[in-house]
């Protein structure tokens, strides 16, 4: 028995695709009548697609309105509380701020110019007063210049008094040059030194002594005749000669000192028994040939210690 392949029969039934239903809703503006919902239903089938739409509208209509307020600025005409900027340029605020800043800078510049001018004027006035004080040499010589300047009579008197004092000090310094601590070196009549000792404190001590003597005198009184006080000066010199130890070492001349006049060094040579810077005359030879008092010879170091301790007067 021959078996045959059994093929079952299959019946194909054609089925349609599921239908798609699309619903759309549209609305109009509020001010216009609203329309009802429109539903559209489409049924499609393969291979042809059929669609059908159904629209219905309601018979009743409704209307709505919206009130919008418009903003209008108030008018500036006749209103004193509102600035009328219609005739003002653009950027008025910036212009005002810039003007204020510029005014501040201009005021600072003016203040600086005025202060500089006043300071310069004050400096010129002081310098003119100092020049007038230094150049003034008598009432009749500069009376016209003093009358032309803006100073009163008190300033003129003070200038005269200062000039008088300076002249008095000049006259008195001519007779006090003998106590000068300086020593000339350009002298052909240099005396041979007996010792090589050089005192480092001699110059300072002589300066302090001359300074104290100068302060003790009244330099504000001017004496026209110098011969009235020459005798007193010579007596002081003789007293100093008696106090000085003539056997002590002499002072060495410094190469940095300048030569002075001979008449201003007479007192120095009298005290130190030296002919340095002097032309040998009869008075100098008589002074040097006078007998000396016998003194005990003192070592240079002991003499320096006495000077530093104040026991020795220079």
Swiss-Prot record:
Transmembrane feature ranges: 93-113
UniProt-annotated stretches for the region Disordered: 32-60, 240-309
Keywords: Membrane, Phosphoprotein, Transmembrane, Transmembrane helix, Vacuole
Modification sites for Phosphoserine: 148, 254, 274
Basic and acidic residues composition-biased segments: 254-269
Localization: Vacuole membrane
Coiled-coil region: none
Membrane topology: Single-pass membrane protein
UniProt keyword Phosphoprotein present: yes
Disulfide-bonded cysteines: none
Keyword Transmembrane listed: yes
One of the record's GO cellular component terms: fungal-type vacuole
Family from the record: Belongs to the PRM5 family.
Listed name of the protein: Vacuolar membrane protein VIN13_4115
Annotated organism of origin: Saccharomyces cerevisiae (strain VIN 13) (Baker's yeast)
Higher taxonomy: Eukaryota, Fungi, Dikarya, Ascomycota, Saccharomycotina
